[in-house]
Amino acid sequence: MIYLLFVGLVAAAALSDMWSMRISNANVTVLAIFYLVLACMTQPQAAIISHVFLALSALVFCFVLFSANLIGGGDAKLFSVLILWFGVSDLVLTYLVLVGLIGGLITVIAITARQISWPEKVIRFMPVWITQRRAGIPYGVALGLAAIWLAPEIAILKPV
């Protein structure tokens, strides 16, 4: 049940980013609170502190990237809250590599799709990042897919 709730929340954020290039604050907040409640029931205080510290560090780093207009605010928040779930573990490096690979694939798809002259009837049903050359890339999709892929390995989600 806990695993499915995590995957559902992450999938909702990724799908929202894919279709509207927006990740709701409510979704990210629920993910953060969900982690903190679950962690308080199952994890030692030192582990919780290390997870929170790493997530706050990620948020500061992402804020710098956001300020430089390199990433979106929703991507920054989603990345930070997902790092909260991964914590200080070897899994973080795997997560970062997967995000890079999936994000690179999405970027290639976007660049390729933007070269196509889509019929007006089709454009109405497509995400803006596919049809508009100056649109950004919905990196929340890569962040979410990588997290869902690795969810079975996240320590706090494993059955006891």
PLM regions with names:
Residues 1-160:
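A membrane-topology feature that recognizes alpha-helical transmembrane segments
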